């Protein structure tokens, strides 16, 4: 019951896209269903291309999308057609996918699962699950608590709770800098790192100043800094590859679903109810970007020409210049429930969402909506 309630509490904080992920978990019966889902390979599905897809990325020229029930979709024609991956060993919802080359990629999802592919997404292997992740976090917390520091002791109690709950906590974001160095973050402050391509993992939870275990939705590295975004307006930054983190003060108390660097020292953070905030000085000062609608922003993307795209859960696209000072709506909408975006090799925009994966032709990415 505790796992079920945890899933429902998580669901209450998420946007349309992530809400679907949490709801799928709660409906599965919580931790009681987790072992079966971790052991059950994803099934062939004739409607896979129209299923809930939660993330999409590039693997060289190939596109890879992941979503509900362990479904992984591949496209070799810039998103015009899709087919299922040959082998996915789990049936849990997969929440994000990233590749560092044409062949090497990782995906994360429910039940603390981390998957790895070495063949461009055709087949996948489990590198980590929730039970192993909880044990790693608890071991690190025990070592940190040996000093008797009150904060470390509190972290130990929280880590022991993760072990007792079982593998019911989802990873929600990941980033790999190369074939070796990667980071994953998730619900209740989950955060781990690897330096050997996922063969072994280390807890980051004692390094991130995140008391109370706020949900962490995104992690990315750009311009030498590692950025983590989460609920209650939290942003964390590491300039040393994750060895230490500092909290970036923000004026917003709601959820950030992502953040990305802008210019030499700028930041763009986006999240619930149309909140988009910009800083020119690495987070020392912030100004709100006016977007006209209070609709949750679910994805952001830097295009090949340097322009920035924001997308909200209604499917509206907004285009801004490289400085992110102003965004204008585009004429071409996407289906509601958009979860992620990527630019295909031919310049088209490809987006994952509640209705599968959509494609927008390159010419429409500059056409502004009529006022």
Predicted regions and their residues:
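Residue-level hotspots at or immediately adjacent to binding/recognition sites across diverse folds
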Residues: 2, 25-371
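Bacterial N-terminal signal peptides
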Residues: 12-23
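Bacterial N-terminal signal peptides that target proteins for export
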Residues: 2-14
């Amino acid at each position: 019951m505790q796992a079920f309630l945890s899933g429902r509490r998580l669901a209450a904080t998420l946007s349309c896209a992530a809400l679907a992920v949490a709801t799928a978990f709660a409906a599965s019966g919580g931790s009681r269903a987790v072992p079966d889902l971790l052991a059950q390979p994803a099934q062939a599905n004739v409607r896979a291309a129209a299923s809930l897809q939660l993330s999409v990325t590039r693997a060289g020229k190939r596109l890879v999308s992941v979503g509900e029930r362990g479904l992984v979709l591949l496209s070799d024609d810039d998103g015009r057609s899709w087919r299922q991956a040959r082998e996915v060993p789990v049936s849990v919802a997969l929440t994000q996918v990233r590749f560092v080359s044409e062949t090497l990629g990782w995906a994360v999802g429910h039940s603390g699962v981390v998957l790895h592919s070495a063949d461009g997404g055709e087949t996948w292997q489990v590198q980590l699950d929730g039970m192993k992740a909880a044990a790693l976090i608890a071991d690190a917390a025990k070592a940190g608590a040996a000093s008797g520091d009150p904060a470390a002791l509190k972290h130990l109690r929280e880590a022991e709770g993760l072990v007792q709950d079982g593998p019911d906590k989802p990873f929600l974001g990941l980033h790999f800098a190369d074939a070796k160095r990667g980071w994953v973050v998730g619900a209740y402050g989950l955060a781990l790192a690897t330096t050997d391509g996922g063969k072994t993992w280390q807890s980051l939870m004692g390094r991130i100043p995140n008391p109370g275990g706020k949900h962490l939705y995104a992690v990315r590295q750009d311009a030498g800094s590692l950025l983590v975004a989460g609920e209650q307006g939290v942003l964390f930054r590491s300039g040393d590859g994750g060895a230490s983190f500092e909290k970036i003060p923000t004026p917003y108390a709601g959820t950030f679903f992502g953040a990305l660097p802008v210019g030499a020292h700028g930041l763009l953070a986006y999240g619930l109810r149309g909140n988009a905030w910009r800083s020119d000085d690495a987070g020392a000062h912030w100004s709100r970007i006016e977007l006209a609608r209070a609709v949750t922003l679910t994805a952001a993307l830097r295009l090949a020409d340097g322009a920035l795209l924001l997308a909200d859960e209604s499917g509206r696209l907004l285009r801004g210049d490289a400085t992110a000072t102003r965004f204008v709506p585009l004429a071409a909408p996407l289906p509601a429930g958009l979860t992620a975006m990527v630019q295909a090799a031919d310049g088209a925009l490809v987006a994952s969402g509640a209705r599968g994966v959509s494609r927008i032709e390159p010419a429409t990415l500059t056409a502004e909506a009529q006022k």
